[in-house]
Amino acid sequence: MDQLQQSLLEAPIIEKDGYHYFVHPISDGVPMLEPNLLREIVIKIIRKAQLENVDKIVTPAAMGIHISTAVSLMTDIPLVVIRKREYGLDGETPLFQQTGYSENQMYINDVDEGDSVLVLDDVLSTGGTLSAICSALEDIGADIVDVVAVIKKVGGENELESSPYSAKTLINVDVEDGEVVIIDSNGDN
């Protein structure tokens, strides 16, 4: 069994406002992220993502940063982090992100019309984050080459499914009876 699958099966589950949330080093930074797990994930992303002609990797703060940094280092593709803080820089584009458990204003810098981007995130659950990011990137005029999330939590409404965008995932899971259940160990293509 691969490390990602095993680590998800061992992940503790918490309930937050009626939402069953798994606590995992990729999505939460706790427990500690082992280098071998991160390496496995990065290799899987590089194999699954369409990287040809990608100018920039775009990821939301905070939990996409460690994954995207590692992919950037392995591919030499520059990294853009979508921040929750406004800087007021020229070309800064705001977006509103709503998930199953939070709402945030976020800001994109350093993505221009005509840029070819890979959107990369840790978890696809409600689709609120990725849908908002893809819409904002489209408004900027960027070409979204591919969208990849490491983990997809199935079993609920997913905004991305009703949008023109789709995401590849490395593994699909659900939470049943207080435990993570592997739905598809290969994720979505």
Curated annotation (Swiss-Prot):
UniProt-recorded Gene Ontology molecular function terms: transferase activity
UniProt xrefs under InterPro entries: HGPRTase-like (IPR026597), PRibTrfase_dom (IPR000836), PRTase-like (IPR029057), Pur/Pyrimidine_PRTase (IPR050118)
UniProt-listed SUPFAM superfamilies: PRTase-like (SSF53271)
Record's keyword annotation contains tRNA processing: no
Origin: domain of life: Archaea
EC number in record: 2.4.2.-
Sorted UniProt keywords: Purine salvage, Transferase
GO BP: any one term: purine ribonucleoside salvage
Membership in a protein family: Belongs to the purine/pyrimidine phosphoribosyltransferase family. Archaeal HPRT subfamily.
NCBIfam families, sorted: HPT_Archaea, PRK02304.1-4
Record's function text: May catalyze a purine salvage reaction, the substrate is unknown.
Entry protein name: HGPRTase-like protein
Source organism (scientific name): Natronomonas pharaonis (strain ATCC 35678 / DSM 2160 / CIP 103997 / JCM 8858 / NBRC 14720 / NCIMB 2260 / Gabara)
